[in-house]
A protein has these predicted regions:
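Extracellular beta-strand ligand-recognition surfaces/modules
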Residues: 5-43
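Extended interaction regions within the primary functional domain
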Residues: 26-30, 39, 46, 50, ...
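A surface/extracellular/periplasmic glyco- and lipid-processing/surface-interacting theme
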Residues: 28, 51, 243-247
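Exposed low-complexity, polar/acidic, P/S/T/G-rich flexible segments that act as propeptides
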Residues: 33-62
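Extreme N-terminal leader/anchor segments
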Residues: 55-126
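Aromatic-lined, polymer-binding surfaces characteristic
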Residues: 103, 107-366
Length: 366
């Protein structure tokens, strides 16, 4: 249940498309009972963004033939992957100790001495504008639409991922540091509403390009709220949403040698992947996910060919087809944090991966 954006270009629609003079359309219902509501139904005159996102609703959407699609838009394709790293039947005492060490390092990194009042105030201000409340029927919500930035009309007060981030992070800080029960309640109201609006497992929200820049604090503050999330009846929906939008599913397999836009992934979603992996309630699944993530990151740190993104044999870092030192500083910092979190454990990166990181630092120094 909930609203799901479905964007698709004519070229990716099914059926006979020899005649491009469209005169009508049909909606064909599946052979089962249910109700569907249509809203914001448009037929764009201007060309749609090429980065329409295949998802659970329209998995055949988009040929994904452009390099700048090989990142944000592949979340559903990656969801079809399975781990080839087996789930351990039980963890050794050493593995349990390592996970606790990593958990404490992450907590120490993310905690602050006191609640930051600015983000809390911003969360409440945005929440007031969002005007979220249960629907009259009691089966959903009413409130401000939350949509992808491409269709967002800010003049009408419509919101997007950055507003979800503002509300969730603000309420998380207040609930965690000040034990504010109202903020705790608001946190889960916003999370439920975000899922209702399409920030959910299996949804691409029409187009999800560049969303990683607008969701980072959703993850860092979800870590602070993890105990409350674990106890909530909607726990599985929250965790599956976090994992899906972190693109943790990509790390069920090693990184493809031809994968482009790696700097974007490291910079915006590596921390999200890490936190999602650490938030499995079952420690065995944590170990499996963390093993997959470390393997994926190590393999992504291989020297990449040509002009695709990543680290080159001379240590230079490529993004958008060229050397991009201005973007690299934040990227290397994020990867460096992951190295620190897993240092001295069986989940640390390979020696080759760390050597390649070192070469990137040296190239930046020069």
């Amino acid at each position: 249940a909930g609203w799901r954006a479905c964007w698709i270009g004519f070229q990716h629609m099914k059926g006979n498309k020899q005649n491009k003079e469209i005169a009508s359309y049909r909606l064909i219902a599946p052979e089962r009972k249910g109700r569907i509501f249509l809203d914001r139904l448009t037929f764009p005159v201007k060309k749609m963004n090429d980065r329409t996102t295949p998802d659970l609703q329209i998995p055949y959407n988009n040929s994904l033939s452009y390099r700048d699609l090989w990142h944000w838009c592949l979340v559903w394709k990656w969801e079809q992957q399975s781990y080839d790293i087996p789930l351990p039947s039980k963890l050794t005492s050493e593995q349990k100790k390592e996970l606790k060490t990593i958990e404490q390092r992450l907590t120490d990194f993310l905690e602050v001495k006191k609640a930051p009042q600015g983000p809390i105030n911003a969360g409440y201000k945005t929440f007031e504008k969002a005007a979220i409340s249960p629907s009259i029927a009691g089966t959903g919500f009413i409130g401000t639409p939350i949509v992808a930035p491409d269709e967002q009309d800010k003049k009408k007060g419509e919101m997007s991922w950055n507003d979800i981030e503002t509300m969730l992070s603000g309420f998380a800080y207040d609930a965690y540091y000040n034990q504010n029960e109202t903020s705790k309640k608001n946190y889960f109201t916003v999370f439920d509403y975000a899922i209702d609006q399409g920030f959910a497992y299996g949804s691409g929200m029409g187009t999800n390009h560049h969303y990683g820049y607008q969701v980072r604090k959703i993850y860092t503050t979800a870590w602070l709220m993890r105990d409350a999330i674990y106890k909530h009846p909607h726990r599985d929906a929250y965790l599956s949403t976090l994992r899906f939008w972190a693109a943790l599913q990509e790390t069920r397999q090693p990184c493809s040698p031809t994968r482009d836009e790696l700097l974007d992934s490291w910079h915006t979603l590596l921390m999200a992947k890490f936190i999602s992996a650490m938030m499995f309630p079952d420690a065995r699944e944590q170990a499996q996910a963390l093993s997959g993530l470390s393997r994926w990151l190590s393999s992504s740190l291989r020297y990449t060919p040509g002009t695709i993104g990543g680290i080159k044999v001379d240590g230079t870092t490529f993004h958008h087809g060229g050397f991009y030192p201005g973007y690299t500083t934040g990227v290397l910092a994020t990867v460096g944090e992951y190295i620190a979190f897993t240092n001295g454990t069986s989940f640390e990166l390979t020696e080759d991966a760390r050597k390649h990181m070192k070469s990137a630092f040296i190239a930046m120094r020069n």
